[in-house]
């Protein structure tokens, strides 16, 4: 097998079986008042808080219509889900402002030596036409973490003022 170079890849976030899955690490960062978000080795956001700007993402809409928005987060080392966190998501004419992350569900230890992922449904958005859509996600308020286990220090030196976003899912709502 011989591959031609340069290799051509497609990094667009496309629909698969009615779901558009948009990894946080596929986005770019818009700096905030006190710095900017970075990405951790697992592709999650790092140091994402109200002062570090917003995450800019894109996806391809094949089927215009209404989509449910799910936001996936991962636990921050030995801290549990941050109760009371609020986010804002903007796309086109849709603004889901100051939405509470409620932990609608949890995927337990999906990767070896990892922490559980949680998801929160934050609302619905409508895309009236096909094509590339831009999405902006920002953190309005960080909730309160409770500790898990017995470690007193944060292994990566991050503050508790931080939410780890993994991905956004847009789920097409059939009529």
Residue ranges and their predicted role:
Residues 1-175:
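Extracytoplasmic
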């Amino acid at each position: 097998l011989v591959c031609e170079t340069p290799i051509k890849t497609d990094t667009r976030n496309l629909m698969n079986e009615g779901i558009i899955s948009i990894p946080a690490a596929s986005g770019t960062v818009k700096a905030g008042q006190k710095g900017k978000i970075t990405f951790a080795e697992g592709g999650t956001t790092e140091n994402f808080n109200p002062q570090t700007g917003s995450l800019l993402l894109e996806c391809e809409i094949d089927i215009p219509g209404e989509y449910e928005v799910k936001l996936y987060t991962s636990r921050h080392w030995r801290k549990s889900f941050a109760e009371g966190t609020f986010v804002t998501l903007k796309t086109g004419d849709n603004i889901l402002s100051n939405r509470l992350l409620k932990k609608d569900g949890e995927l337990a230890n999906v990767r070896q030596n990892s922490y559980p992922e949680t998801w929160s449904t934050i609302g619905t958005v409508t895309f009236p036409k096909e094509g590339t859509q831009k999405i902006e996600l920002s953190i309005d308020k960080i909730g309160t973490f409770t500790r898990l286990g017995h470690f007193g220090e944060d292994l990566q030196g991050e503050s508790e003022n931080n939410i780890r976003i993994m991905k956004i899912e847009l789920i097409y709502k059939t009529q």
